[in-house]
């Protein structure tokens, strides 16, 4: 007896195989994510793609053209009280209904990003430039399809062991005079100028950690279960204003080192850059959310592969149609000429058969022709001519006159 495998068992086996080969597989409402639970970088890298591979499993694949948005959030490893927006990419009019999500889209727009977080090589990934230890934390990838009521979210733990070369000490103060760490968490009141200072690593390009490029949005009671919170429609609408396009933050040069101004809402920040030449202090200054960085204008124009593919497809269809017509015309011409030749050969064969039949029917000698004449005519011809009649044409006008006078 042959055992039958149900569809659910087949899907479970497939997911088990994919999990063993590629990592964790989570099936969401609209899309599924394939990713590694923990991604570790042991040394310096130019860029590192972090995220989840987005796929359609089972009945998730849409039957009509669709669109959607991908958002990437960063929760610093040293602070579990807030999260920072890194990237937002919008995909429109995706007509290719393959297993890969957002493939064959007519338009792809990077609506929001920070200087060190760009769009990855595939949807669902963010490309981090030269990540350091302070870029370690949790990366959340949220995906919202336009035709679905709520988004899907996936969590990837990212760890970088690269320390960087330069060091930055940063402390912040809120209006109450309390120190706030660079990730937005409040600590005890300030005891002195150097108290409760944090040490951050700068990479070779002089860039600050990801946590210092945008305001860390407090998540309150939702921080412990941030992924479950990001699965709600409420969270998607709350983050919409945070991911709105903003202006590019100005840069300040200190001791020949370019340092981007950080963004901490309603806070006063004091920074010291420790270099080989000594310590340079910066005066406290107020920053607003206008310092958030949006690289939409700096991004290269989004690629639109589908129109190009459509033009190529149209060219192939037209060329194939013309070639088919030429091929059919050649075949039809050959058939017509073949039929004409066969018809001509049939006519010639019919004529030759008719001529052969006539020859067979024609008498072979004079005696045979004479034997076919009427006996009376033969007798009269013999009486007049005195000799046997050889042909009908032998009877002339004089013979007829003689016959008539003799009979008279």
UniProtKB/Swiss-Prot annotation:
Coiled coil: none annotated. InterPro entries: Herpes_gI. The keyword Signal applies. It comes from the Viruses. It comes from Psittacid herpesvirus 1 (isolate Amazon parrot/-/97-0001/1997). It is a single-pass membrane protein; Single-pass type I membrane protein. GO terms for cellular component: host cell; host cell Golgi membrane; host cell junction; membrane; viral envelope; virion membrane. In epithelial cells, the heterodimer gE/gI is required for the cell-to-cell spread of the virus, by sorting nascent virions to cell junctions. Once the virus reaches the cell junctions, virus particles can spread to adjacent cells extremely rapidly through interactions with cellular receptors that accumulate at these junctions. Implicated in basolateral spread in polarized cells. In neuronal cells, gE/gI is essential for the anterograde spread of the infection throughout the host nervous system. Residues 1-23 form the signal peptide. Glycans are attached at residues 93, 96, 165, 286, 294. Its main location: virion. Residues 24-311 are virion surface. Residues 172-207, 357-376, 388-408 are annotated as: Disordered. This is Envelope glycoprotein I. Interacts with gE.
């Amino acid at each position: 007896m042959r055992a039958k495998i149900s569809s659910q068992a087949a899907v479970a086996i497939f997911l088990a195989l994919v999990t063993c080969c590629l990592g964790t597989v989570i099936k969401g409402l609209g899309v599924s994510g394939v990713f590694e639970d923990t991604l570790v970088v042991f040394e310096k890298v130019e860029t590192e793609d972090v995220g989840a591979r987005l796929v359609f499993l089972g009945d998730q694949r849409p039957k009509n053209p669709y669109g959607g948005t991908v958002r990437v959030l960063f929760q610093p490893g040293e602070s579990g009280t807030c999260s920072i927006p890194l990237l937002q990419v919008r995909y429109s009019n995706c007509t290719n209904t393959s297993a890969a999500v957002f493939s064959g889209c007519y338009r792809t727009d990077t609506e929001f990003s920070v200087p060190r977080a760009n769009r990855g090589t595939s949807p669902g990934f963010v490309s981090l430039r030269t990540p350091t230890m302070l870029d370690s934390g949790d990366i959340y990838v949220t995906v919202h399809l336009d035709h679905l009521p709520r988004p899907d979210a996936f969590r990837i733990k990212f760890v970088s062991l690269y320390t960087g070369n330069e060091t930055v000490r940063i402390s912040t103060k809120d209006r109450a005079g309390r120190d706030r760490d660079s990730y937005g968490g409040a600590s005890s009141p300030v005891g002195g100028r150097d108290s409760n200072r944090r040490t951050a690593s700068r990479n070779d390009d002089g860039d600050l950690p990801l946590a210092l490029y945008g305001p860390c949005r407090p998540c309150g009671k939702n921080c412990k279960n941030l992924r479950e919170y990001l699965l709600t429609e409420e969270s998607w609408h709350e983050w919409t204003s945070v991911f709105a396009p903003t202006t590019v933050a100005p840069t300040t040069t200190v001791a020949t080192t370019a340092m981007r101004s950080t963004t901490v809402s309603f806070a006063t920040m004091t920074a010291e850059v420790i270099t080989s030449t000594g310590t340079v202090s910066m005066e406290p200054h107020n920053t607003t959310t206008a310092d958030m960085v949006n690289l939409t204008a700096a991004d290269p124009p989004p690629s639109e592969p589908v129109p190009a593919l459509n033009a190529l497809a149209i060219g192939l269809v037209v060329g194939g149609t013309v070639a088919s017509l030429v091929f059919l015309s050649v075949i039809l011409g050959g058939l017509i000429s073949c039929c004409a030749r066969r018809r001509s050969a049939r006519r010639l064969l019919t004529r030759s058969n008719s001529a052969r039949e006539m020859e067979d029917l024609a008498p072979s000698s004079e005696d045979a022709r004479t034997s076919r004449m009427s006996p009376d005519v033969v007798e009269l011809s013999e009486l007049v001519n005195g000799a046997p009649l050889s042909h009908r044409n032998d009877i002339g006008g004089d013979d007829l006159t003689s016959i008539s006078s003799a009979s008279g």
